[in-house]
């Protein structure tokens, strides 16, 4: 049986204890990592057998529902992460939300970094299903933030109206948004804004707390695609990510509004580089430079991001594991978007489309949000290059259709590891 002292030195307890003692949190993170590998997973006895608790998923259409079997549920139901997160908490959002008519949702979230290990028997097959066959049990993820490798990164701005790259980062030693306490959420905010104050040059900016904004200011930023929406999505609310809203939430942006950090929405942080026009290479260069600088500043203050070789960067939703990267453009393609081959072209190019305002919105004036569908198994450079090559292909198709010429469905891109 674990001693009282070893229990004290797990999860959030250790972070708070060492912070109180003035110990470097980087050292704390190292100690927590060692414990995480060695600590026994706690069991939480239940009154009823697993079969009595198994959720009714017969009408569900999400990755969790497809992968969760009675046997897996029975094996994992009583397990608890060092921070106290359970399997039922992981899957609740997928139980409450059966599915999406057009997009197959994941249906589960992680409450902490350890969730992906303690409940790996479910997370691993869900990750494999969601990520085009990426198997975290046998594969490793690579990271590459060298923007100089990008080619053909300038789009035709008659068609491409804006360009954007985003990712997420989680701070090791603190629970993720579905499970974090108020104190942890406020600590995330404090760690982030203290580090961001060190940004210089074109990255320098300021932080705006959501609780200090007027409703009008919030809506203006949302309409301009600078700020996250209010937490009305059932996927967020059922996962517990809207608790205490808007406490410790906010947005940091540079003075040009081309480099932004969202704090405490779905993830601890979301890092975004964006601008009008079609210069994706410049957007990605700023993204890489800013992200590296943010990580350096956070590490200087004794913290680090969650990362491992199996899963890459750890984020709340399994759909964002690996790079967490979504590179997208707003592109006007009135003729191609009406062509019956459009969906197949996107599928083969490993791209996805959304409406002008994002998920669940319509395309206004034939403008679509086109982005990469994959997150893990390919590096950041590879994913951005896929978007660049793919969007250039879409624009070329649009030009051919304007001239009355035929277009072709491209061959499907090879999966990772088959280059």
Swiss-Prot record:
Residues 46-132 form the Phosphagen kinase N-terminal domain. GO terms for molecular function: ATP binding; creatine kinase activity. It is found in: Mitochondrion inner membrane. It is a peripheral membrane protein. GO terms for biological process: muscle contraction; phosphocreatine biosynthetic process. Belongs to the ATP:guanido phosphotransferase family. This is Creatine kinase S-type, mitochondrial. It comes from Homo sapiens.
